[in-house]
UniProtKB/Swiss-Prot annotation:
Name by which UniProt lists this protein: Ferrochelatase
Summary of the function given for this chain in its UniProt record: Catalyzes the ferrous insertion into protoporphyrin IX.
InterPro entries: Ferrochelatase (IPR001015), Ferrochelatase_AS (IPR019772), Ferrochelatase_C (IPR033644), Ferrochelatase_N (IPR033659)
Gene behind the chain: hemH
Pathway field: Porphyrin-containing compound metabolism; protoheme biosynthesis; protoheme from protoporphyrin-IX: step 1/1
One Gene Ontology biological process: heme biosynthetic process
EC number: 4.98.1.1
Keywords: Cytoplasm, Heme biosynthesis, Iron, Lyase, Metal-binding, Porphyrin biosynthesis
Amino acid sequence: MSRVGIVLLNLGGPERIQDVGPFLYNLFADPEIIRLPIPALQKPLAWLISTLRSNKSQEAYRSIGGGSPLRRITDQQARELQSLLRQRNVDATTYVAMRYWHPFTESAVADMKADGIEQVVVLPLYPHFSISTSGSSFRELQRLRQGDERFAQLPLRAIRSWHDHPGYLKAMAQLMEREIDACVDPSTAHVFFSAHGVPKSYVEEAGDPYQKEIESCAELIMKTLGRDNPWTLAYQSRVGPVEWLQPYTEEALEELGEKGVKELVVVPISFVSEHIETLEEIDIEYREIATEAGVSNFRRVPALDIDPTFIASLADLVETSLAGPEVDLDEAAALPARTKLYPQEKWSWGWNNSSEVWNGRLAMLGFSAFLVELISGHGPLHALGLL
């Protein structure tokens, strides 16, 4: 078998406090995250937002030790996956490709070429597809592929989504079972799935399958778990004034407390490794909200990290992909046929249907409101502590 390069896609995270500002800048400079009517404003606005949010974000990272463990854990996952694939007689080398912090996608591509890789499998470390996560990373990889003849010649396969893979579901269920069994009354402990949210317009206007995959995944995990515990699915990490997927985690926690729920097992469903959203947002912020609402036993299921069952499921995904056809990254990033996602260089702005729909009317209104708020010094972003 030819030499296979496994590209593990992930978000990236600041490893030191001084990295927080540059990381945020890279994040908000991505047109997949914020699309502006005038492209020249992208970088200035990214600088402004990252500057305004740096102090608050730095405080959050200080509370978990001064930086994100995401790169360290992703590197461990890469090593474990590479080792297992080689045990299965697959001549594979893994490469970590972060979207917004080191090691960037360009580094992974350069390393693969230097190592003489002969074919590529792209594996997002996002179980559920979204245009803002896997989609953005696919597009970045495709951009590099189009500008690099040698890289473009390599046969490539990409795994778009794996939220329903039996091995992944089993790994999640096993970790949940341990926390449920540790409750005073395991049979009545309330299972609380918390997924990273996205703006509602992504789903309703652009046709992003993320919500559908999250909901299906939660049901499949509970079916795999084989228990009758009551459960809830909510969405966390909302920022800004626009409407995101609901119910919001903080509001759902308060509601469960009001209903008398005492034992809660929180499951970070869309996260495969520990990072700021699990260690700070769930473990600190949401724990406090739940406790104040009356929950007396707040237990959080650990992220998958290098769980053997999880790593084995990733290896299964790679082997299945290698046995299948090559994949075009543009097709891997595509949305349902009912909505056309235009190439970034052809996106238009305005009230017509040729605009990028999920960045259309809401974004236009949001951008106008943002400018007004910057000038006035008052508004919802100030109330939320974002400005």
